[in-house]
Swiss-Prot record:
This is Large ribosomal subunit protein uL30. Keywords: Ribonucleoprotein, Ribosomal protein. SUPFAM superfamilies: Ribosomal protein L30p/L7e. NCBIfam families: rpmD_bact (TIGR01308). The keyword DNA damage does not apply. InterPro entries: Ribo_uL30_ferredoxin-like_sf, Ribosomal_uL30_bac-type, Ribosomal_uL30_CS, Ribosomal_uL30_ferredoxin-like. It comes from Actinobacillus succinogenes (strain ATCC 55618 / DSM 22257 / CCUG 43843 / 130Z). One of its GO terms (biological process) is translation. GO terms for molecular function: structural constituent of ribosome. Belongs to the universal ribosomal protein uL30 family. Pfam families: Ribosomal_L30. PROSITE patterns: RIBOSOMAL_L30. The gene is rpmD. HAMAP family: Ribosomal_uL30_B.
């Protein structure tokens, strides 16, 4: 079974770079305090690193 991580949006996407808003949508996050469970891959980790100031990650 693949390792999964929980990602929660903790800061608003209002007044953020369009690229960062698109990254949040790519992660499946729609609004604040929304949590998604994702498979831990290098691509997902890269997306999380890009918006690390807006999300919380639980291993």
């Amino acid at each position: 079974m693949a390792k999964t991580i929980k990602v929660t949006q903790v800061r608003s996407s209002i007044a953020r770079l369009p690229k960062h808003k698109a990254t949040l949508r790519g992660l499946g996050l729609r609004h604040m305090h929304h949590t998604v469970e994702l498979i831990d891959t290098p691509a997902v980790r890269g997306m999380i690193n890009q918006v690390s100031y807006m999300v919380k990650v639980e291993e």
